[in-house]
Amino acid sequence: MAAIEAVNAREILDSRGNPTVEVEVLLEDGTFTRAAVPSGASTGAFEAYELRDGDAGRYLGKGVQKAVAAVVDEIGPAIQDLDAADQRIIDATMIELDGTENKSRLGANALLGVSLAVAKAAADSAELPLYRYLGGPNAHTLPVPMLNVINGGSHADTNVDIQEFMLLPVGASTFSEGLRWGVETYHALKSLLKKKGLSTGLGDEGGFAPNLDSNRAALDLLMEAIDAAGFTAGKQIALGLDVASSEFYSDGAYTFEGQKVDAAHLTAYFADLVASYPLITIEDPLDEDDWAGYDHFTAELGSKVQIVGDDLFVTNPKRLADGITRGVANSILVKVNQIGTLTETLDAVSLAQRSGYTTVLSHRSGETEDTTIADLAVAVEAGQIKTGAPARSERVAKYNQLLRIEQDLGAAAVYAGRSAFPRFQA
């Protein structure tokens, strides 16, 4: 393999018009790659630290020049001449250089940009696609796309509390077919919204953001759209939710649909939804620190539905290990910028899979054209990917990359489909 010759960084814009970090890596053999870092809107309290400048006179305080300087002035010199193939050594070097528990000195956005760019460079130098370089010869499973077609919560300015309402084409035979089903249902949903006089404006992740009377009304719209597109709900296309409950939790209570309620109330509410709709996955149904609530929620619904920990686990192996020991949730959402390096991300995925937890690769609401997570989903055989609606180029870029990977794999490609959701019975 080739040693790292130079590392550069710059400030670019994400899909919400906020600055983010882009890193470029040059190897001694001439290989040149770049990676861009995403940013979230609903962020977990235990995520690795995203370093921003705090200068109110520039980008409203959201500039990332400090993180860029950290890459150029500190990280680059520290990893120069290291072998790009030594990902674990490079990531460990950056973590030690930062010296904090949450990567707050140099910024997780600085570390991640370098970590991903190095992995891409190593793959290119080895003349391998990234998914093959990271996953080896057995990486061949295409994930089920979890298409976020109705946006609420912190992703849209509406009365809908739940952040994401998703379509999951579990009955398709290939990824490309599943994506087509999702796209056709997305367009059917747009037509329905127009007929009903509802907004077809888009939220951060490309989904529609209509102002509805209730969260259940959004599920009803999805059921109607699936039927209008010519598909069978449950058998061909299932439903999923990202509740993002930490966004409406305060002082020991949840403000949900205009009422102050507790975890037991929400558990009963979602149990009713699971019984009423082909709902197969629920993400962050409770606050990230409501462990007792998760104990009850998992006991009640863990055998019936996928319970995904996002803010709960924040892609952190230590948080995940605590959850596994306690037996809460049964799936982890994997966001590379929550932990800040590729190797720590891979460690979290490995721990989850060894412990019988499913894994979901995920974008952030503030995205770029970077497609790393598409390759990563195939590399780790995640079986599921969340990267928004089939709209807005920063979302579609990931789906298009998965289409390329499917074609590259040829006859070896397998679509995860229903097998990605072992608890789902239809």
Swiss-Prot record:
It comes from Clavibacter sepedonicus (Clavibacter michiganensis subsp. sepedonicus). (2R)-2-phosphoglycerate binds at residues 163, 335, 364-365, 386. This is Enolase. The active site is at residues 205, 335. CDD domains: enolase. Belongs to the enolase family. Binds a second Mg(2+) ion via substrate during catalysis. Coiled coil: none annotated. Mg(2+) binds at residues 242, 283, 310. One of its GO terms (biological process) is glycolytic process. It is an enzyme of class 4 (lyase). Its cofactor is Mg(2+). It catalyses: (2R)-2-phosphoglycerate = phosphoenolpyruvate + H2O. Gene3D superfamilies: Enolase-like C-terminal domain (3.20.20.120), Enolase-like, N-terminal domain (3.30.390.10).
